[in-house]
């Protein structure tokens, strides 16, 4: 299965799950994440503002925004620009209908980067939506622990890869 076919297959599988089921699964996946040694020890974590077909992170962001330095991606042109989340951060709908923070670029270090994806395999390969935003961003941060989070139906036997694809160090799902 090539990347386009895999994206279509995952989209079909997602339709078999109710919004309520995905929200409940998201809570359980994020509970696994917050009990993970890498998350517990991390002071600065890059997360993401979820789209409807991703592990739902909005409540998780609110829960942790005062406990850790939380960084969120914004999309500017072809690049991810990281922004630190603060108690005063305002949000606006950005490209792809993603709720993005409106603040200055974060230029510090990261302890952990949490990455969404359309599909992952158990050895850390991932495909996103096909624009390469995360791969371009992650290639500048190869020394940082990268954890992909996904629903079980997004975890497949093998993800087709290309030379510029950046692997996750680990993938967290319910299974």
Label each PLM-derived region with a short phrase.
Residues 1-100, 104-108:
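N-terminal active-site beta-alpha-beta segment that forms phosphate/nucleotide-binding
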Residues 81-175:
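Conserved phosphate- and dinucleotide-binding cores of soluble alpha/beta proteins
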